[in-house]
Amino acid sequence: MSQRLPQRIDLLAMADAGRTLEGRIEVTSLDRVLPLLHDTEGVLDVVMRMDRDPDGTRFVAGTIEGRIQLLCQRCLEPVVLPLNLAFRLGLVADQEEASRLTPRYEPLIVTAEPTRLADIVADEVLLAMPQVPVHPEQELSLIHI
């Protein structure tokens, strides 16, 4: 998977067309994640399928795979967080529509403006990150030998 993803897309049109995007996104494009990282090098593999379900709900379902490097708050050394994330987002226009969304989707409020793909990826990565990154106990003992 070496293809670069487009920066912005019309999610509603892509869902209506039943499109799938596969590619890589640079970690450096995840603006809200960058301040939380120890190292900003690397790429994440992303697959996003946009479609309508049998009820007519537009959605984005996908996966994000890769690794990010955080700072262990116990020893202040780098700690790698492997990412193997799956998500299902229902595309809605407002909070009222979001409240009617079935539980199988998390709401994503979209407008007529094209959506920045890096923002969707950043949201999912932020949700996967621990509040306090630390090495697992077995790794920590090896660091201090």
Each PLM stretch: what is its role?
Residues 1-69:
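A positional/architectural concept
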Residues 56-63, 123-135:
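Short, intrinsically disordered, charge-biased short linear motifs at domain edges
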Residues 73, 141:
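Cys/His/Pro-rich metal-binding microdomains
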Residues 76:
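Cys/His-coordinated zinc-binding microdomains
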Residues 82-85:
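Short Cys/His-rich "knuckle" micro-motifs
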Residues 98-126:
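Short Fe-S-cluster ligation motifs
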Residues 143-145:
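Conserved small/polar residues in nucleotide/adenosyl-binding loops
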